């Protein structure tokens, strides 16, 4: 019988409800700090407030406070937003913070207990540059053992055994570093054995998703249990995206709510808007790919939380889905993307 492994235990897939497949509720993102423009340095060093919020929205990675997504203020703001998500019909959140991002399993478990939202935690490794010395020299065999234990045996969290429910996000740069290659191979090997879902994070060039899918597939991983994240900032050409879709993985648009065209982590491209995300998803639906589409926000900075003037985890449900309905997307298609596809991806033995 198929099951989904949440941080509070296994459940049947039909209990998930509408699911956000790529989010963070606690992590350390300070590795990605970018020095601010000299003229705005003072504003971006201050606490986030109305008089500085405009600067933070344009240069989110130049505010260290914005990147501290694990301090007391951030955790309380996250809690309030998860409650809003639940209030507006949210059922589950897939937490993608892995080794290198300092995930907080204790907080995730507490959120699951106190909000009624199902949380699925991931195992795996983020990019090489975020790892400490104890992880950087791990072999493929050591990684497979680690991921397997996190899923099958679980992790002791204050005396409670918490099991991870998927592998991800497994992240890499381009070209893929040796450490990252090990993580991709380990993910493919474990997926083949356990039948779990996998989520991959490509670098910010269009060739990257092709390269990491090749490594994952060569290791034995199944394409139909793999999600390619961040396609809305990676593959902009529809013909190239359709070519990539032939590999058979889930196609995820997971930066909903990011409306600034200036993308600080890759200034050579213009970030697309929510309207363009909807347009692209509709094109993919028309190509017969509705059963492989996923949507999320990838919230990982304070300024995207409602307490800091952001959109929160309920943005897709309250703002995006109504716009999709207005443009002709059917309820059946929305349910496929937000309920059925996440459940199929997260289900073991499916």
UniProtKB/Swiss-Prot annotation:
Coiled coil: none annotated. Pfam families: PTE. A divalent metal cation 2 binds at residues 169, 201, 230. A divalent metal cation 1 binds at residues 22, 24, 169, 298. It comes from the Eukaryota. Its EC number is 3.1.-.-. GO terms for biological process: catabolic process. Binds 2 divalent metal cations per subunit. Its cofactor is a divalent metal cation. GO terms for molecular function: hydrolase activity, acting on ester bonds; zinc ion binding. Keywords: Hydrolase, Metal-binding. Belongs to the metallo-dependent hydrolases superfamily. Phosphotriesterase family. This is Phosphotriesterase-related protein.
């Amino acid at each position: 019988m198929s099951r989904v492994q949440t941080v509070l235990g296994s459940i049947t897939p039909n209990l998930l409800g509408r699911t956000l497949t790529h989010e963070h509720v606690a992590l350390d993102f300070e590795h990605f700090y970018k020095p601010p423009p000299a003229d705005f340095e003072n504003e971006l060093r201050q606490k986030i407030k109305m008089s500085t919020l405009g600067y933070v929205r344009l240069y989110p990675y130049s505010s260290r406070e914005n990147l501290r997504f694990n301090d007391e203020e951030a955790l309380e703001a996250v809690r309030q937003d998860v409650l809003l998500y639940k209030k507006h019909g949210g059922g589950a959140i897939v937490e993608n913070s892995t080794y290198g991002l300092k995930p907080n399993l204790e907080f995730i478990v507490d959120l699951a207990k106190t909000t009624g939202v199902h949380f699925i935690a991931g195992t795996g490794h983020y990019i090489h540059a975020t790892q400490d010395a104890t992880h950087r020299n791990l072999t493929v065999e050591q990684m497979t053992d680690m991921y397997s234990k996190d899923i099958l045996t679980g992790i002791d969290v204050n005396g409670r055994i918490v099991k991870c429910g998927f592998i991800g996000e497994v992240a890499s740069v381009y070209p893929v570093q040796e450490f990252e290659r090990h993580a991709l191979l380990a993910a493919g090997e474990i997926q083949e054995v356990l039948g779990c879902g996998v989520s991959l994070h490509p670098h910010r060039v269009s060739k990257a998703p092709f390269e990491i899918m090749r490594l994952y597939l060569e290791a034995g991983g199944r394409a139909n249990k793999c999600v390619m994240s961040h396609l809305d900032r990676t593959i902009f050409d529809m013909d190239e995206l359709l070519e990539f879709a032939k590999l058979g993985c889930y196609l995820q648009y997971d930066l909903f709510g990011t409306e600034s065209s200036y993308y600080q982590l890759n200034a050579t491209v213009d970030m697309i808007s929510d309207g363009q995300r909807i347009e692209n998803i509709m094109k993919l639906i028309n190509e017969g790919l509705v059963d492989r589409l996923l949507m999320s926000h990838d919230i990982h900075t304070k300024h995207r939380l409602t307490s800091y003037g952001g959109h929160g985890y309920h943005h897709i449900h309250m703002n995006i889905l109504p716009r999709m309905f207005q443009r002709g997307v059917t309820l059946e298609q929305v349910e496929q993307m937000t309920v059925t596809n996440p459940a199929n991806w997260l289900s073991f033995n499916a």
